[in-house]
Amino acid sequence: MDKVGKMWNNFKYRCQNLFGHEGGSRSENVDMNSNRCLSVKEKNISIGDSTPQQQSSPLRENIALQLGLSPSKNSSRRNQNCATEIPQIVEISIEKDNDSCVTPGTRLARRDSYSRHAPWGGKKKHSCSTKTQSSLDADKKFGRTRSGLQRRERRYGVSSVHDMDSVSSRTVGSRSLRQRLQDTVGLCFPMRTYSKQSKPLFSNKRKIHLSELMLEKCPFPAGSDLAQKWHLIKQHTAPVSPHSTFFDTFDPSLVSTEDEEDRLRERRRLSIEEGVDPPPNAQIHTFEATAQVNPLYKLGPKLAPGMTEISGDSSAIPQANCDSEEDTTTLCLQSRRQKQRQISGDSHTHVSRQGAWKVHTQIDYIHCLVPDLLQITGNPCYWGVMDRYEAEALLEGKPEGTFLLRDSAQEDYLFSVSFRRYNRSLHARIEQWNHNFSFDAHDPCVFHSSTVTGLLEHYKDPSSCMFFEPLLTISLNRTFPFSLQYICRAVICRCTTYDGIDGLPLPSMLQDFLKEYHYKQKVRVRWLEREPVKAK
């Protein structure tokens, strides 16, 4: 214990020597043992070399009084080593940023009890500087006090600690619990505040009727969110027809690529639903159909069997080759269309069927022959009539991209391709709309060609083929030739039209044989009647 007491007294004396009293002669020299930490220039430097004016400064007296340290006589500091100076050097490097922005003239604040009674609390950096040692410690205390006062001034809006006491007593009582809680939490967890002006926006809610979205003019108040997005609403709800000027007046600079694709798909959908303009001097054929509306049926663009064809004033004759009940639900059964149907007063004979709804639709269309039937017949990848199972048997074990062209088993389509991709045999129908062939007639962004052979040539290039599209790089050649009758039909169809076949001096059976490879293009759809059927 005696040894510990001597060490403590020695340590206390060293700390007190840093704060010399006025008129005291402090001629403490650094011992030679401190050469391990100090440079050669710092060996002969004496801490007591400062002038009496510097020692008698009121700032130094104030520091000594606040720290509770009494002036002491000169005593040499011996047996110093590097270990005792490490905390001082680290402390200087940490608080260097705060010392750069400190200005003198600010009243010092008391240090807390922990740092005041700690053994290292009063130790100064006597070995790290020479002339600026005392000013460094004073500036450090100035920075701590000034930064604390600035934080209080920013928070309470006062300029001194004395004003802060009066302001705090006046404002704490008037501040609400939420404000005091927010001040306590601070900026770490900011609480969201809602202005009173935003409350009426949520209170004025009302239901929007579907009929309001179908109006030509905006029914919503100007400046509202719906009024600003009215052009987007009309883009998806307004019927687009060749006579519609909505998209013609729309600013194309405001439309992005995705919006442009959506706009094209919408126009294609309505074009499939309404039909296209017929070519001049084209013979118009008419379908009249009456069927039951079933909303579960998927509406498609093709004309299925089960419809009644009339020419001129002849009566309607139902077709007998109706495969199933679903074939009678054709494109004319598009009950989801929301625009008003044009009611015609003309009387048409039709076959009525019982059901929940009775729909009478008149569809005008034209017949067109396949334009490149001769090239298709001469193509070695074309196998003629073949179902999917025969095609899969031929493609089994073939490399990626092997394909063949065959007749489609569905009556609504002419041709299909069977190909190998992803180690399996896949099939894709060739669709047609507005005299263009593609693998998806509903999407105008998909590649399309005016001929079937042109479509096949495009997908032979792997760089032009998407991962979900057919890859047709290697053709699987057929092993048999077509008959002379097939080749003659292809040659005749290249030189005439569908309606021109009727003028050829041929028997009706041969005329039907020549018309086999043709497609129907819809040119106009008219909804004549739509009314509920009374249950018996």
Swiss-Prot record:
Chain spans, region Required for interaction with IL4R: 1-50
Induction / repression: Up-regulated by EGF (at protein level).
One GO cellular component term: cytosol
Keyword Repeat: no
Gene3D superfamilies, sorted: SH2 domain
Residues of the SOCS box domain: 471-520
Keywords: Growth regulation, SH2 domain, Signal transduction inhibitor, Ubl conjugation pathway
Residue spans of biased composition, Low complexity class: 158-169
Documented effect of changing residue 406 to K: Abrogates the ability to induce EGFR degradation
GO molecular function: epidermal growth factor receptor binding; receptor tyrosine kinase binding
InterPro entries in the cross-refs: SH2 (IPR000980), SH2_dom_sf (IPR036860), SOCS4/SOCS5_dom (IPR022252), SOCS5_SOCS (IPR037343), SOCS_box (IPR001496), SOCS_box-like_dom_sf (IPR036036)
Domain annotation SH2: ranges: 381-476
Pfam families: SH2, SOCS, SOCS_box
Biological pathway: Protein modification; protein ubiquitination
Domain notes: The SOCS box domain mediates the interaction with the Elongin BC complex, an adapter module in different E3 ubiquitin ligase complexes.
Subunit structure: Interacts with IL4R; inhibits IL4 signaling. Interacts with EGFR. Interacts with ELOB and ELOC; mediates EGFR ubiquitination and degradation.
Entry-linked PANTHER family: PHOSPHATIDYLINOSITOL 3-KINASE REGULATORY SUBUNIT (PTHR10155), SUPPRESSOR OF CYTOKINE SIGNALING 5 (PTHR10155:SF15)
Protein name: Suppressor of cytokine signaling 5
